[in-house]
Regions:
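Solvent-exposed, non-transmembrane regions of integral membrane proteins
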Residues: 1-851
Length: 851
């Protein structure tokens, strides 16, 4: 039965949210321009009521879509495309924003929340700010309308409540069965089945939403000709946006580090770049806004940068969702036909902001004060310029597909390709920009706080410089000791190392002074120390990352494989230890993850059923000394996830186990995810490059032998013994009838490092003979009880073999990567301290009636 009601309800909420947003924008516009207090109050109240209606409708849309996903209503295209009935609940949440419609909805939700916060905290600016807010919400709501205009072959938006049959109307099944409902959905992308994907997108979209607030205040300031006053209420929100958007970017990097297998945390993917660039410009805007607050300079620059940030957010949305990136990004959505609508959205606010700024430009106050080279304003300007250049370099190359489209649109011909080596291309530029930013953040702080004269520069910087020099020399010697003399030949690496150390040292001195006098002012110094540590961590973990899984056997794994494959990977046969990076490394076998209880299960210990998610325990299953299941228990597993147990043993005998994962999704293919051994000084990062697929390996023709009880024999060169044969009255959870006969053999197989018990079964049922073989997966052998010879007390066994289980592993050491993570924590802490200070400052002005 098709559940029409919930889809119709959701669609009703979509239309209501769109209409209410338009009504709110109109009412707030009228209220802002009203000449009488009575009309202003009337229209503002109408705007507020309309926006609350809009927000309630957005929540209604969210609830409706969650109901469809959670109840597995696969008659709806959205639920069918991105979920299945076996997904854990927390990944069902990820399904919500996996598609374009859901991510637009998430963006709308956060902006609705922020709009309500502004309505309740800032009555002075409510009218003009909420006009912009509501207008943006109307554009976003239009993206999920899914309405075809009467008389036009044009659809506005793409609805998350469309039925599968409406999208796949040409499918034969819907021709014969219009009400057909699939029993299962396509499932969630394996790479998104990660806990970071539950929290990273909401954080990132909250960052997107927060950039609207300073943009709205800036537009409101231009609109009302309150050119100076908008900065104070906008600054805390800019800091909030910088913190949240930065946190979202960092979460994405950490997700990539833990989930993808390229060995890093930033791949310079076009969509990563399209978020990174607005964040850079937002940081630049924060600095110019702070400069204006303190010296009334850089007001125009602040306006330009704040507007640019929001426009870049819209541009990144266009890049991601229009399909223009094609295959150049792993993050981009498929084109839902919204490219024209997205372009209108972008151009409306771009040209609207430009026109308003041009009209008001001459009225915007400026200062005639000459900026000295030794003034803080000068150094802020230089830093802002460098940040903008960093963003410009990245966005120009990222936008190559856009430039091609524009040239082709005007009759030209262009097929420029994005950089083949993205990491190398962007890094060679961003490295030098980062060095300059680090040095400026060190030196600029002294000009900001100390207001030093030219003759005092050397004195103020001497201690931080000498401290940095000493630490730098020590670390260079550590590099030579650890990586050899070649490690210091890259001048860029050495410069970024010194710049990072100098940033920490110089800002540390500033921080020490501020903590004694004014702790509330320390946010900038803390954030800059974090930036310095991040640069040091990036330099070590990326520049001095080392592959440790080298093939030292002198043998090729495969003549068809690349030189890199044969050189940089380690072949591990099961239970055969090898040496690697000061460890004894041993592959212990593949494992499955139990669904109901936290733990891994050895496939040797379970029987698979017709349902790939359900298995039966052959014996008591124990993991980490905890009994998970009893023999013959039926329980659920995650069949898509296969983990490979890699045991590391240090020189002191200490053991650590890694579980790198392969996800095999029937629709989306295989995806490898690493596991990481974390130490204070470095990470050991390992993932599976290749493996022996037991499903594809062919069994040899069975060798038949006759044995008696307790007789030893060889099973594929492994000493084995038939210990006993006993009658059984059930096979797994299935009870046998009294007329059935089943016997189970107990065969002990001695592997090189471990003993195994094989239990093949011989069944006579309804005068039919059946045989259930037993596979010892670790050894690549299969034993079958072929026949019973009561006259001689012998048993016929069939022995088959195939390739012994193995994996090919790639492992890397990431030195001092924890310095990077510590730096990110300090950056976020610095943002938090600065934000609290600006909020308190704003509240004090509110209490005085000045806001």
């Amino acid at each position: 039965m098709i559940h029409y009601f919930i889809g119709d309800l959701g669609h009703f909420f979509v239309i209501t949210s769109f209409v209410a947003a338009l009504a709110s924008a109109f009412s707030y516009f009228k209220g802002t321009n009203a000449t009488s207090l009575e009309k202003k109050i009337f229209w503002t109240q109408n705007g507020s009521i309309s926006f609350y209606t809009h927000a309630a409708s957005v929540i209604g849309i969210c609830i409706s879509l969650f109901v469809i996903i959670a109840n597995h209503y696969f008659e709806y295209h959205y639920a069918y495309s991105y979920s299945d009935s076996k997904l854990p609940d927390h990944y069902l949440v990820s399904t919500f924003w996996n598609g374009q419609e859901g991510s637009f909805l998430l963006w709308m939700f956060w902006q609705a929340v922020l709009g309500i916060v502004i309505i309740n905290t800032n009555k002075f600016w409510e009218g003009p700010v909420m006009t912009v807010f509501a207008l943006v919400q109307a554009f976003l709501a239009s993206m999920i309308l899914g309405v075809v205009l009467p008389g036009f072959d044009f659809r506005i938006g793409s609805s998350p409540f469309v039925l599968l049959r409406e999208v796949m109307h040409d499918a034969p099944i819907f021709q014969s069965q219009p009400d057909f409902i699939p029993k299962e959905g396509n499932g969630l992308n394996p790479l998104l089945q990660n806990y970071w994907m539950v929290i990273h997108p909401p954080t990132l979209f909250l960052g997107f939403a927060s950039t609207l607030v300073p943009f709205s205040f800036c537009i409101a300031g231009l609109w009302l000709k309150r050119y100076r006053e908008w900065v104070r209420p906008a600054l805390p929100w800019a800091l909030f946006g910088g913190a949240v958007l930065g946190l979202g970017i960092l979460m994405g990097g950490y997700w990539a580090y833990e989930t993808l297998n390229f060995g890093g945390y930033w791949n310079w993917d076009p969509v990563e770049n399209a978020v990174y660039v607005p964040w850079l410009i937002l940081i630049a805007a924060i600095h110019t806004m702070i400069t204006y607050k303190n010296s009334e300079t850089a007001l125009k620059a602040s306006m330009i940068l704040v507007v640019t940030v929001f426009i870049l957010i819209l541009y990144s949305t266009f890049l991601t969702r229009s399909g223009i990136l094609g295959d150049s990004s792993v993050h981009s959505f498929t084109d839902l036909g919204l490219s024209g609508q997205l372009l209108i959205y972008l151009l409306f606010f771009l040209f609207g902001a430009i026109v308003l700024a041009v009209v008001r430009w001459k009225e915007i106050p400026t200062t005639d004060k000459e900026v000295s080279t030794y003034s803080r304003e000068f150094w802020i300007f230089i830093g802002t310029l460098v940040l903008c250049l960093m963003g410009f370099q990245v966005i120009m190359a990222t936008s190559i597909p856009v430039w091609n489209s524009i040239i082709n649109l005007f009759g030209g011909s262009s097929n420029m390709a994005p950089p083949a080596d993205q990491i190398g291309y962007y890094t060679k530029f961003q490295l030098w920009f980062a060095i300059v930013v680090a040095l400026l953040s060190a030196v600029g702080q002294f000009f900001w706080w100390k207001k030093i004269e030219p003759r005092q520069i050397g004195k103020e910087l001497l201690v931080p410089f000498l401290t940095s020099l000493v630490i730098f020399v020590i670390l260079v010697n550590v590099l030579i000791f650890q990586f050899g003399s070649d490690s210091i030949k890259n001048a860029g690496y050495l410069l970024i190392l010194f710049a990072g150390i100098f940033t920490v040292s110089a800002n540390g001195k500033i921080l020490f002074g501020l903590l004694k006098s004014s702790p509330g002012l320390s946010g900038g110094a803390i954030a800059h120390i974090g930036i310095g540590l991040m640069l040091i961590g990036i330099m070590f973990s990326s520049g001095y990352s080392k592959i440790v899984s080298l093939n030292n056997t002198g043998l090729l794994y495969s003549r068809e494989a690349s030189e890199e494959y044969n050189r940089d990977n380690l072949l591990l046969f099961i239970n055969e230890p090898r040496s690697m990076a000061g460890y004894e490394i041993e592959y212990k076998g593949d494992r499955l993850e139990a669904r109901e209880k936290a733990g891994f299960v050895n496939p040797n210990d379970i029987e698979f059923t017709d349902d790939p998610f359900m298995v039966v325990a052959r014996k008591d299953i124990v993991y980490n000394k905890n009994k998970l299941f009893h023999a013959n228990d039926t329980f659920e597993i995650f069949p898509e996830n296969r983990y490979y147990e890699i045991q590391l043993t240090g020189t002191g005998g200490q053991k650590h186990t890694l579980f790198p994962r392969i996800q095999d999704n029937p629709t989306m293919g295989m995806a490898a995810s690493p596991d990481i051994k974390r130490d204070i000084s470095k990470d050991l990062y390992a993932h599976i490059v290749d493996l022996n697929d037991p499903e594809k390996a062919e069994w040899s023709k069975p060798e038949e032998i006759k044995v008696t009880a307790n007789q030893e024999f060889f099973a594929n060169d492994y000493v084995s013994a038939l210990e006993k044969v006993e009658r059984v009255f059930s096979i797994g959870p299935v009870k046998l009838d009294s007329s059935d006969v089943a016997v189970k053999a107990h065969i002990r197989v001695k592997g090189e490092y471990e003993e195994y018990i094989a239990e093949p079964i011989f069944v006579i049922r309804n005068r039919m003979v059946g045989r259930i073989p037993y596979e010892v997966r670790d050894l690549g052998i299969q034993l079958t009880l072929l026949n019973i010879h009561p006259e001689t007390n012998q048993f016929s066994l069939g022995i088959s073999s195939r390739q012994k289980d193995y994996v090919v592993v790639k492992a890397m050491e990431k030195p001092l990567i924890n310095v990077l993570w510590l730096g990110t924590f300090l950056v976020m802490t610095g943002f938090g301290v600065a934000m609290v200070r600006r909020i308190r400052e704003f509240n004090k002005m509110k209490e005085k009636g000045l806001e």
